[in-house]
């Protein structure tokens, strides 16, 4: 890699994190957002955060969660990460993520986003799907979702797995991407692996990074095929770190079991290709695999998840179990 990357608040060794450097004086900050924004872009920050800092915050509530046709609240942010410069990696640890509402909403919206119905962009001869709004009850201290289905004479009771659909930095250049879009900046990836205990790596394109988050889901199946998860509000605790001089092209995710790469584009096959190439290069650069050995490893060990197949860009997650990687 040439000159050693200078690391602020964290040291990267073969893809694993060590104890933060002793000179980092972390603070715990509490932040209650007042209003959301519709795009991921460079704008006046709502909070300034130093590497190592912990932020206790929450997603935004509003009419969307409480009534038919209610307004979407937008994204929280941006947080300005002190010391972040283009070519760094922003490391976002999700220390805690919990629902803080007694209900969640999932909708079928005619002409909007769905993996199995026509949308507003393409004219079709078949009729749109009917509009439906399902209100799930959140019970047992936020651990179980319950939905009565009177048309089917059935009742669903399922364990919940809270996640954040959207984590992002400001995109490259002067671009502003709407909240529905995922891309190399993160955004609306709808990856169910972005949950408590996960660490998300995002490329930095601007001084300060400009971090955003939102779109809490109490639960979501792979693909998000109807166009929404169990949409609800969340309490979340982040810790922010920087890896100076470590340049990545696309988002990465880690947890105790897996390293993961995310590709977001259409068609779906290209999203898979992006995530696969990113994983091969991660093994090559950080775990010191020879390139074609890395490809063979990915070919036999990778698990692939369609995170979403409904957004303007589709998203695919490629996962490699850590137990097969060198320590």
Please identify what each model-predicted range represents.
Residues 62-73, 97-108, 208-218, 307-310:
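Short, Lys/Arg- and Gly-enriched loop/turn segments at beta-strand edges
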Residues 160-269, 280:
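Conserved mixed alpha/beta catalytic, RNA-binding, or beta-rich assembly cores of soluble enzyme
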Residues 9-19:
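Bacterial N-terminal signal peptides
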């Amino acid at each position: 890699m040439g000159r050693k990357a200078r690391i602020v608040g964290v040291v990267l060794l073969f893809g694993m994190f060590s104890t933060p450097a002793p000179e980092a004086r972390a603070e715990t900050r509490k932040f209650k957002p007042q209003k959301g924004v519709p795009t991921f872009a460079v704008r006046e920050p709502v909070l300034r955060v130093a590497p190592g800092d912990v932020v206790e915050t929450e997603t935004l509530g509003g009419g969307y969660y409480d009534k038919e046709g209610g307004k979407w609240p937008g994204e929280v942010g941006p947080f300005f990460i002190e010391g972040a410069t283009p070519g760094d990696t922003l490391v976002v640890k999700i220390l805690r993520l919990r629902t803080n509402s007694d209900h969640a909403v999932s909708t079928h919206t005619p002409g909007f986003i769905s993996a199995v119905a026509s949308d507003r962009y393409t004219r079709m001869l078949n009729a749109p799907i009917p509009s439906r709004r399902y209100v799930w009850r959140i019970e047992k201290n936020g651990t179980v979702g319950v939905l009565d289905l009177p048309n089917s004479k059935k009742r669903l009771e399922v364990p919940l797995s809270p996640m954040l659909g959207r984590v992002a930095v400001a995109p490259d250049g002067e671009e502003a991407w709407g909240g529905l879009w995922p891309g190399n900046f993160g955004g609306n990836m709808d990856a169910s692996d972005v949950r408590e205990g996960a660490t998300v790596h995002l490329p930095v394109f601007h001084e300060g990074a400009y971090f955003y988050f939102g779109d809490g889901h109490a639960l979501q199946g792979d693909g998000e095929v109807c166009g929404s998860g169990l949409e609800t509000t969340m309490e979340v605790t982040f810790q922010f770190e920087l890896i100076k001089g470590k340049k990545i092209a696309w988002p990465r995710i880690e947890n105790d079991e897996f390293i993961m790469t995310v590709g977001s584009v259409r068609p779906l096959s290209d999203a898979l290709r992006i995530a696969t190439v990113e994983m091969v290069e991660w093994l090559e650069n950080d775990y010191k695999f020879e390139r074609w050995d890395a490809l063979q490893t990915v070919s036999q060990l990778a698990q692939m998840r369609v995170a979403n197949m409904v957004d303007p860009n589709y998203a695919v997650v490629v996962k490699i179990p850590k137990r097969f990687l060198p320590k």
